[in-house]
Each structure stands twice: as C-alpha cells, then as structure tokens.
Amino acid sequence: MATIGMLYICTGKYTVFWPEFYETFSRNFLPGCKKEYFIFTDAPSIAHEDDPAVHRIDQLAYDWPLSTMKRFAIFLTQEKALEQLDYLFFFNANLTCREVITPEEFLPRPQQGEQLLLVQQPGFWNKKPMFYSYDRNPRCTAYI
C-alpha cells in the first residue's frame, strides 16, 4: 500500500475550505492508500486535527503572491517527514474530490515503465504550447 502525502496551506480565510477538502479526499482519493495530511496553518485549531494522519504545522499567513512564492520553502520545513512518503501532492485549498479516484487510474505503474505523474492545470487546456507560461529567458534556471 502506497503512502500518500497531502500538502495543504490552510491560512487566513482559506481555513474555511479545510473540512470539506479533508472529508472528500479521505473518502474518494486513492482508497486503500495510507494518506498523511500536512496542514500548514495559522488557525489556533482545525477540524480533524485529532486524526493521527493530520499533521498540523504552525504557519504564518502571507499575502498573495508571497504565499505562492514561498510555498516550497514552507513545505521544506517538513523535509524529513516528507522523504518517508511514496507520493507527495500539493492541492489548492478550495479543491474537493467528488468522485472516487483509484490508485490504478492515477498513480504511475512502475511495472509498465511509468515513473512520474503529471497534472495539467485547466488554464492550459486547449492552448497551443507557445502560449504556455513557461519561462523563456535562457539566463533563468527555470528556462524551458
């Protein structure tokens, strides 16, 4: 059984989304897999924090765009724990999982040579690659 890490930033007004996120993902996302929720929050308490799979981590709320720019630095505060997981996902706070998503249809299948899982943001659907927001500055380390 794979162990899935769920990264979730739950600061400021976004705390309102956490209960439904937890309930729908616990029920529908990768049934049969062990899920560990890493909740970065400034709230004094959150729903479901008594669940041993919910790891509440104190986190200062940042205004946008700083919250996005510092996201990976925030996650790396838990690097040791995250290294123990088989798969790691970050989800936007307002996402819900309305239908069952099985490991067979979602996770890579190593026996078939699959090693990575990629998800495309809906904003890129039906766009020509020249309109993707990739960094095209050859001096940038994020250059594509």
Where are these regions (language model features)?
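Short beta-strand-to-loop acidic/aromatic patch adjacent to the donor-nucleotide binding site
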Residues: 84-94
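Glycine-rich, basic loop-to-helix element that forms the pyrophosphate-binding segment
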Residues: 67-75
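Conserved donor-nucleotide/metal-binding helix-loop-beta segment in metal-dependent transferases, i.e.
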Residues: 96-137
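Generic beta-sheet signal
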Residues: 4, 86-88, 117
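Catalytic core and acceptor-binding pocket of nucleotide-sugar-dependent glycosyltransferases
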Residues: 141-144
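Short His-Asn-centered micro-motif
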Residues: 8-10, 39-42, 91-93, 99, ...
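N-terminal anchoring/stem segment of glycosyltransferases
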Residues: 1-67, 80-84
